[in-house]
Amino acid sequence: KEKYITDDEREKCRKVADAFAELYEIENILVVDAGRYGFVKLQYYRPPQGFEDAITFTDSQSMFENLWEEWLDTQLFLLAKGTPMAGMGYNEIFRCLPKEKQEELMNRKAGFAKTAGIE
């Protein structure tokens, strides 16, 4: 049977998935190991149909970037909720934040990368 992900990338993807565990608690997202097919990000669960969105990853770098964007967007949404920033786009919200908060958020990327073993 054909494999769509190398054993090395599969191990790296597993580390990336584990690094973003907190995201799955705060957002309607789940990342699952789909064996020889890679890892699948399931998003927007709607009963009874199930997940509306499924993205398959076979490389850890693109999976990391995707989950990082998801995490950052979620944080920005939560920060803007109930404020005048609520109607803004994510980039606008980020620019409105104090420099310290911007740095704090961006430093989390380095933390996730270290946990995931991404250079």
Task: For every predicted segment, state its role.
Residues 14-18, 77, 83, 110:
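Short, intrinsically disordered, low-complexity terminal segments
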Residues 1-27:
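Negatively charged, low-complexity tracts enriched in Asp/Glu with abundant Ser/Thr
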Residues 21-25, 38, 114-117:
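Short intrinsically disordered, low-complexity segments
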Residues 29-32:
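Assembly/interface hotspot detector across virion components, adhesins/toxins, and nucleic-acid enzymes
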